[in-house]
Design a protein with these regions (language model features):
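Bacterial N-terminal signal peptides
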Residues: 7-17
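Metal-dependent phosphoester-hydrolase catalytic domains
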Residues: 188-192, 242-252, 260-425
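OB-fold nucleic-acid-binding modules
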Residues: 300, 389-481
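Beta-strand-turn-beta hairpins that frame and shape the catalytic cleft
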Residues: 22-27, 36, 181-185, 194-218
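A long, amphipathic alpha-helix that forms part
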Residues: 225-248
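Structural recognition of the beta-strand scaffold that forms the well-ordered cores
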Residues: 26-29, 82-88, 148-151, 175-179, ...
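N-terminal, active-site-proximal structural segment of metallo-dependent hydrolase catalytic domains
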Residues: 20-172, 383-422, 455-458
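Second-shell loop/turn segments in exported
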Residues: 50-61, 117-126, 162-165, 188, ...
Length: 481
């Protein structure tokens, strides 16, 4: 069934019911995995520019921007989604060069391309630009125009960065919204040990649509982390409830990387009260949300069969950390309406996937840099329906239900056959960015036990596995040579 998900986006459009109103548009949720700028100042060592081969650099930032824009161009005949909720933009740790007027910024650099800015025209001012400005400029260069930009107001802790003590300040990222609709208002809500929750209200042909972008505390199955996520969820729930108290039919989309499974209560029962399902109230009964008013939240993962619910991998299993939830107002005939059954995972085989299992092709700084993200984006369609009846509801053809399994899906490693896995050759190591994340059959001889290494085609390669039993098994083989 995955092929149906892929085909929808490779064609640049979804199979949709007949249009009911003037305009349809796409809302994309995209964790771009560490989109860091070119100033060389970074919370993560992997993104500090050291000059070493595997170091981050302006040239690798350019590759990363190019790959992000490639994904965005698969929408709307190359024009990009109308609304994008981004995760993992770097907080600007060189705040001496802010961009407060994006129109003025684009005008200033209209005679240069980002490719020139990050190469032959690179200077200290360009190095200091925040990533949202560089991405906006790249979009303009490629003809994806008309975006307004809002970012979270997360402040960099420069003293903690200088001290190198990441236990003091671990926040490296902020959230962002790029919108082709006018921005009416934005707020940035601080929440414990996580990125600020970004709230953006957009003017959709005269009607307000509020988008919340989240990136909660990591480690989905960890009880201590779940305690923090409960606080993250409370920040969001309280703010959403204040909006709904003023208008029970308010159109609200809640999106982002929640570092929780959509069925967190079933997958991790040891956590007790969960942030996503119990505090925030994410649930899978679409009909209940469609006929309700107020606080009900339908999680769009339930639009897909259970075997198609995946956005990321960990430990040989699929996860659903990327989420999109909607309020009852998006099922009425006033303002903005969800296009039923339009939710999909953005899988572009061979581009944002790797290997025979089509796992996410995560970003790597190896070689020239390559990959896209360790998360697949997720998308859904919406439409404007004018000043219709708030009491009238969308007729659901196949409403989502609470059919979630109690275990995560296996990615399918056990299904691979030998002829699906190529043999490793020394030539593969010469282009690590291209081959990072692929599966290979390795035939060689153990050349070192500590550190563990293998010789293939006359070249030595270090071996590592998170599986201690496998490491010990490899060390039990006799060293040759």
């Amino acid at each position: 069934m995955k092929s149906a998900v892929r085909a929808a986006f490779l064609c640049g459009a979804l199979a949709l019911p007949p249009a009911l109103a003037a305009r349809e548009f796409t809302v994309l949720t995209y964790n771009v995995e560490n989109l860091f700028d070119a100033d060389g100042v970074a919370m993560f060592d992997d993104y500090k520019e050291t000059g070493e081969e595997a170091s981050y650099s302006p040239a690798k930032l350019l590759v990363k921007l190019r790959n992000i824009v490639h994904v965005l161009k698969t929408f709307n005949d190359g024009n990009g989604p109308e609304i994008i909720a981004f995760n993992e933009f770097e907080i600007d740790f060189s705040p001496g060069s802010p961009v407060e007027d994006y129109g003025k910024f684009l005008a200033e650099y209209k005679n240069l391309t980002v490719e020139q800015m990050l190469a032959t025209k690179l200077d200290d001012n360009i190095r200091g630009l925040p990533v949202e400005a560089l991405l906006l400029k790249y979009l303009e260069d490629e003809g994806l125009t008309g975006y307004e930009v809002v970012v979270g107001r997360d402040e960099p802790d420069l003293a903690a960065l200088e001290s190198g003590d990441r236990s003091v300040h671990r926040k490296a990222h902020k959230n962002a919204v790029f919108s082709k609709f006018p921005v009416k208002e934005s707020k940035s809500h601080a929440t414990p040990d996580a990125r600020d929750i970004l709230e953006v209200t957009l003017d959709i042909d005269g009607h307000p649509l509020t988008v919340f972008v989240n990136h909660w505390k990591s480690r989905a199955s960890d009880p201590q982390a779940e305690q923090t996520r409960r606080l993250n969820a409370r920040t969001l729930r309280d703010r959403a409830d204040r909006i709904l108290a003023g208008d029970a039919s308010a159109d609200i989309i809640i999106a982002g990387d929640f570092n929780s499974q959509y069925n967190q209560t079933k997958i991790n029962p040891h956590l007790g009260k969960t942030a996503l399902n119990d505090v925030l109230g994410s649930q899978g009964d679409e009909a209940a949300t469609a006929k309700a008013t107020g606080s009900s939240l339908y999680n769009l993962w339930h639009e897909l069969p259970p075997e198609e619910r995946f956005s990321d991998t960990y430990g040989g299993k699929w996860g659903t950390l990327m989420q999109k939830m909607i309020t009852p107002g998006l099922y009425d005939h006033h303002g903005v309406q969800y296009v039923d059954d339009s939710f999909a995972v953005v899988v572009l085989p061979g581009f944002n996937t790797v290997g025979p299992l089509d796992l996410p092709r995560r970003w790597t700084n190896a070689g020239q840099g390559g990959g896209t993200s360790d998360h697949f984006p997720i998308a859904a369609r919406f439409r404007t329906v004018g000043d219709g009846d708030k009491a009238k509801r969308v007729a659901l053809s196949d409403p989502g239900t609470e059919d979630s399994p109690s275990e995560l899906l296996e990615v399918g490693l056990h299904t691979l056959k030998p002829d699906q896995i190529p043999s490793f050759k020394a030539v593969h190591a010469k282009d690590p960015a291209r081959h990072m994340g692929e599966f290979f059959r390795v035939r060689g001889k153990i050349s070192s036990l500590r550190p563990l290494a293998i010789e293939v085609d006359g070249q030595n390669y270090l071996l590592h596995s998170h599986d201690d039993d496998l490491r010990q098994q490899l060390r039990s083989y006799p060293k040759e040579g």
